[in-house]
Every structure is written in structure tokens, then in C-alpha cells.
Amino acid sequence: MEAIIRTERIEKIYYQGRPEEVRALNQIDLEIPKNRLVLIRGPSGSGKTTLLNLISTIDRPTHGRIFLRGEDISRYSDVQLSRIRQKTIGLIFQSYNLLPRLPAWENVAFPLLPLGVMERERRGRSVEMLIQLRLEKRVDHPPEQMSGGEQQRVAIARALINDPEIVIADEPTSNIDAESIQILLDIFMDLKSKGKTIIVSSHDPVFLDCSETIFFLKDGRLVNIEQRESR
């Protein structure tokens, strides 16, 4: 299987102003296959979110290298990494990271601003995405007037607005209702059918049945890899 992301002995160390270091990740070697739904599991504090931050280029490893489509991006500048996030990676944060008073469509359109997309097109693309997520009645409503499940769907729409090749989601089903969870699963399956790669960090058992590659972390180490047949 072709790897879209590969890590080579990556480590993340935090010093936190104390003499002893905190090693959040330790010597992680993994390959994330293209066009797969990948699940990252492990107990709280095992390094799941830290790993997502590194492979999404939000943060940099203390040691080791990260490859995207075979190219070492470890020494890319911040500007280069920002361009990768804009064009290649869609991020779904556990905390949603929405602007609470802006209309839903403007939140969704936010990633289009640096690309110079005109307002009419931004709104059109955002509304289309919100309709796909069954939020057609919430287009002009701000997130502060929405339920947790609706806010998560707005965050998903924002992550997908640039048609990213890779979608990365951190605990995407936490604090949302059953309907929103099913919508999310349907979206992920649809994305995969279009050749996208989906990487999810979650404790939720709903992802176990649909995931094809499962990485298990413990105490900052990769302790198990499970490969399944493509679905």
C-alpha cells in the first residue's frame, strides 16, 4: 500500500520549565496508507493528540522526520507548512474552534480567505457544504445559537471546504448526538470512496468497525498496529 504520510523515529519532548523533560512521543515509526480510514487509539495521555498535531504540521517534532507523499517536510518553513494545511489537510478539532458570533457560512468560508476567493463564491461554496451536512436552515445562524452536534458539523464543513486530500479529526464524536455521529460516519465513508485519507483519534467504538488501519499508543509509544481489509 502506498503511504501518504510516514514518520521516522519522531519524538516530542516538552520541558515545561522544569528540570525533567516530558516525553509525549517516543521513537514513533508509522506509515499511513493512502485512501484508508485510519484510527489512532490509546488511553488518555498516550500521545494521540500530540501525534495528530505533528502529522497535521500544526506542531513540529523535537526529533525525527515526517514525510508527505515521500517528501521530507520536517525542515519546511512555517509558510510552507501553512500552505500544506491550506491545500492538502482538513482539520477537525475537538473544541470546534469556531467564531461564535459569525454566521455559520462565514465560519465555513474562513479557509478560503487567504486564497483570495471572492465573497460571492465563498458564500456559495459554504452554503453548498452546509446543505450536504443537513444544516440548510442554519446557514446564517452563529454557532453560539447551535447545539454541540450542529457546531461540530459546521467545523466539519470548514475542514472540507478546500477539498483536502487528507482529513484529520481529533475526538470528533465527543459531546455530539447520535444523528450527528451517523452523519459524520457517512461523510467519512463518502470521502474515502473519493480517494481521500481520513485519520481519526477517538475512544469511540463506532470507529472500530469502519477503520482499516488502527494504531494503538501507550505512554507515548506505538505498541500495536492492526491492518484490516479495505471496505
Q: Where are these predicted regions, by residue range?
A:
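Short coil-to-helix segment of the ABC ATPase nucleotide-binding domain corresponding to the Q-loop/switch region
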Residues: 102-110
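Conserved signature/switch motifs of ABC ATPase nucleotide-binding domains
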Residues: 86, 141-144, 162, 194
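Helix N-cap at the start of a conserved alpha-helix in ABC-type nucleotide-binding domains
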Residues: 178-180
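Helix-to-loop junction immediately C-terminal to a conserved catalytic motif
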Residues: 56
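Catalytic Walker B motif of ABC-type/P-loop ATPase nucleotide-binding domains
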Residues: 167-170
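Conserved ABC transporter NBD signature motif
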Residues: 64-72
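Conserved ABC ATPase signature
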Residues: 142-146, 150-152
